[in-house]
């Protein structure tokens, strides 16, 4: 080979080897696995009852095979759904199975699989998931005409043993009940799905369950499309919010809804939950979580962001430095022919990542440059990782690759921290070459749906990015928070990042070309242009933007608690502040005497830990007891829930989020008034109007009765257990302090933190307590140097109310 060519090859191989070696070193990682969208019908429809399993198929519902709790196995080609059971059934003791089948696949060839199962005489229930769109590939309409009545007629003609329909809107079937094919067909609400599936699995032969609920993504698209002055799909004037003060962070709302719009919120009192209003598709299944913290706002609308205030008022308060922005000195692409300029856009599917790549591509095209845009998406559009490779050259004939090679990304626009710090993205980066603009706000992954204690190693991921690009080449922007505060919707974080990168001079395109590309895209043009402008402003003068924002309107950002073991410059001061906040909290909860009892215990622990462990222990046992005892002493009974809901701060927070004519509804399961679900044995929540605020204010004033002989709520086993736990924990503290030493300090902290795991209400809290009892007993056995013993589980709590 010629020497110059050999040198280029060796140089390229050296870059590849260096990146592979860097990625081979141990480093923190996180995976953004594709999952169902917020409000997706499959969040509910793919569940099977205890003791059953299902077979997967082609469609979004295939992702149920990723989720162990759904017990969905394998998949087939289109038209083969459920057919493997024909061969398996004669050779197993299993008597029945479910099979998932999408409506598009049904129309294509899936009905032939059902015909084969009917002919074979196997016991199987096909769940035909009718969501009115080919959702996996972009929401196209199913080829041909298809409706639930037509499916019913065809399945009846094929000889199905039983046909039922499940839907989130049973009332819409009143109009078709008179059709001959619908005669005798049962229509059930989706809340009855578990009970109904238990009935269906006992039906001999091939039965059909049609689950009718419109695709969540398609609902969102249709609502945005205005037809005759109205949304193309009904958009209820209703929003779900969570009173974080009431929330226990148990995660039952995520269990019930499997919705990624239910996000973690770290607070001084632990991890809670909040609803991401920007991504919520108004499915409302989260309301089934057995928790009194859920409130719906009926009527009104979300307040617009700060930037949408009146132009005159806005101009008057906008800092002078943000009025006229200078154009940056941009990177120029010359006709050198050596290499293209590679921009890698990373993020979460369904949030507009591909759109950013398209805007860059169109802007380059408008300037007459050579450009290639390659989107790596697939199933990733459903909440997974998405990459858009944008290659820009001076002329089209200088493009030689559509994909950015290893170490060849000049700019990374990271719309999501997790995806940006993945190995696939890090491999494209190289120190002294790559610049990165990264969204520092973290969206939870699908792991959070199954693990309420899920924590992302955010700082470690940021370190990975800095190592891959160089100490000064990566900039982090709280884009989601800023977009929600400035624009009223977090969806505008991506064009905001694009504007930020452009103002920094890292995008080799004219501003006018990018703005024209946004106009040609034709979607929320004014808002996207505004977001692009705000990104430029943030890049130019971040402090001025912070001054412009009203702190009361700024979306709440709370840092995660300091990791245990990490040094603290002022541990004693931190403990003082923690105790002070908890004393104030318990005083408001009950009275000063109650708070004094708490303070005496914590100060006693502090003295003993100081004497035996010293400052080297960072007062971590004191911190654990301060948080654990506070949690047990402020158990959320009827008085406390009433106090927290009627607190003026909660109502003020709603006023800050909503405008117009709105009212509140509370979703509760109060004693006596709630019926018991015969299928689950759990009280069913009911709606109560705004008048409940007055009742709650009155009930909150009766907290003096808490624990007294005349306490009408204190006689239930649940309340007696909560009060007894306080005494048990104080006994535990005594045991820990009696033998505390450096050798068992970590075990003492582990035991002292057990109350943090006792979360939730009613049966949810009971299940957590059962697990904690086992850990408690095992930990005490280790504390006393004995083999662990399995403690008899406590008597189940029967009187359960939320």
Annotate each language-model stretch with its function.
Residues 515-521, 525-802:
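Active-site loops and adjacent core secondary-structure elements that bind or stabilize anionic groups
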Residues 69-73, 133-148, 175-185, 228-245, ...:
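Short beta-alpha connecting loops at secondary-structure transitions
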Residues 211-214, 219-220, 225-228, 248-306:
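Iron-sulfur cluster-binding cysteine motifs and their immediate structural context
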Residues 1-150, 192-195, 305, 313-316, 320-430, ...:
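Thiamine diphosphate
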Residues 133-229, 522:
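Glycine-rich ThDP/TPP pyrophosphate-binding loop and its adjacent helix/strand module
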Residues 146-149, 162, 296, 301-345, ...:
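Active-site cofactor/cluster-binding pocket
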């Amino acid at each position: 080979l010629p020497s110059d060519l050999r040198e280029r090859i060796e140089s390229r191989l050296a870059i590849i080897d260096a990146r592979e070696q860097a990625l081979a070193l141990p480093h923190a990682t996180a995976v953004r696995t594709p999952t169902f969208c917020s409000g997706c019908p499959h969040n509910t429809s793919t569940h099977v009852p205890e003791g059953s399993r299902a077979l997967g198929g082609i469609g979004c519902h295939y992702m149920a095979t990723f989720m162990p709790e759904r017990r969905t196995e394998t998949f087939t080609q289109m038209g083969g759904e459920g057919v493997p059971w024909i061969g398996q059934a004669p050779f197993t003791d299993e008597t029945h199975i479910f099979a998932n089948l999408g409506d598009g696949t049904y129309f294509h060839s899936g009905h032939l699989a059902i015909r084969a199962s009917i002919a074979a005489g196997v016991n199987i229930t096909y769940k035909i998931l009718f969501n009115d769109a080919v959702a996996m590939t972009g929401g196209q309409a199913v080829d041909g005409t298809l409706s639930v009545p037509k499916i019913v007629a065809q399945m009846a003609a094929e000889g199905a043993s039983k046909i039922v329909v499940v839907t989130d809107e049973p009332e819409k079937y009143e109009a078709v009940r008179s059709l001959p094919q619908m005669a005798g067909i049962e229509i059930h609400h989706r809340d009855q799905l578990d009970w109904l599936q238990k009935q269906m699995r006992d039906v001999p032969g091939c039965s059909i369950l049609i689950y009718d609920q419109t695709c969540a993504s398609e609902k969102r698209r249709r609502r945005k499309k205005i037809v005759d002055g109205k949304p193309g799909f009904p958009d209820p004037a209703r929003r779900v919010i969570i009173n974080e003060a009431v929330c226990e962070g148990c995660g039952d709302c995520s269990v019930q809804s499997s919705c990624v719009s239910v996000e973690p919120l770290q607070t001084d009192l632990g991890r809670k939950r909040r609803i991401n209003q920007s991504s919520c598709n108004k499915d409302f299944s989260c309301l089934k979580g057995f928790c009194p913290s859920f409130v719906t706002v009926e009527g009104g609308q979300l307040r617009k962001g700060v930037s949408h205030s009146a132009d005159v008022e806005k101009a008057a308060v906008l800092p002078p430095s943000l009025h006229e922005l200078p154009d940056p000195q941009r990177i120029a692409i010359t006709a050198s022919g050596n290499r293209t300029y590679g921009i890698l856009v990373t993020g979460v599917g369904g949030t507009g990542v591909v759109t950013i790549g398209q805007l860059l591509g169109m802007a380059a095209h408008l300037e007459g440059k050579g450009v290639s845009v390659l989107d790596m998406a697939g199933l990733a559009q459903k909440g997974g990782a998405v990459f858009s490779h944008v290659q820009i050259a001076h002329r089209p004939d200088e493009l030689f690759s559509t994909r950015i090679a290893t170490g060849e990304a000049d700019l990374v626009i990271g719309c999501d921290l997790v995806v940006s710090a993945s190995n696939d993205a890090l491999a494209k980066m190289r120190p002294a070459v790559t610049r990165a603009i990264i969204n520092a706000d973290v969206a939870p992954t699908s792991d959070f749906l199954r693990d309420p204690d899920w924590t992302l190693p955010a700082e470690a991921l940021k370190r990975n990015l800095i190592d891959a690009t160089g100490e000064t080449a990566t900039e982090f922007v709280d884009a989601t928070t800023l977009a929600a505060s400035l624009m009223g919707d977090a969806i505008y974080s991506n064009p905001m990042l694009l504007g930020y990168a452009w103002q920094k001079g890292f995008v080799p395109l004219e501003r006018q070309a990018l703005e024209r590309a946004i106009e040609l895209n034709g979607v929320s043009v004014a808002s996207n242009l505004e977001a692009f402008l705000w990104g430029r402003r943030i890049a130019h003068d971040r402090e001025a933007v912070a001054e412009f924002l009203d702190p009361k309107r700024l979306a709440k950002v709370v840092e995660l608690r300091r990791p245990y073991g990490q040094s603290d410059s002022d541990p004693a001061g931190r403990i003082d502040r923690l105790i002070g906040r908890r004393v104030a909290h318990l005083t408001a909860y009950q009275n000063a005497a109650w708070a004094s009892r708490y303070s005496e215990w914590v100060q006693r622990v502090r003295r003993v830990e100081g004497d035996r462990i010293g400052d080297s222990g960072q007062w971590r046992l004191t911190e654990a007891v301060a948080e654990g005892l506070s949690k047990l002493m402020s158990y959320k009974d009827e008085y406390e829930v009433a106090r927290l809901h009627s607190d003026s701060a909660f109502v003020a927070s709603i006023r800050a989020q909503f405008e117009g004519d709105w009212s509140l509804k509370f979703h509760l399961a109060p004693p006596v008034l709630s019926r018991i679900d015969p299928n689950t044995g759990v009280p069913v929540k009911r709606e109560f109007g705004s008048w409940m605020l007055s009742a709650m204010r009155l009930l909150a004033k009766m907290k003096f009765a808490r624990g007294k002989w005349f306490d009408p709520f204190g006689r239930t086993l649940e309340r007696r257990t909560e009060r007894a736990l306080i005494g048990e924990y104080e006994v535990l503290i005594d045991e820990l302090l009696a033998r505390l030493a450096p050798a068992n300090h970590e075990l003492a902290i582990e035991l002292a933190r057990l109350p943090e795991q006792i979360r939730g209400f009613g049966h949810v809290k009971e299940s957590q307590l059962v697990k904690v009892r086992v850990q408690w007993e095992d930990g005490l056995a280790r504390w006393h140097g004995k083999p662990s013993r399995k403690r008899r589980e406590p008597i189940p709590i029967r009187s359960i109310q939320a």
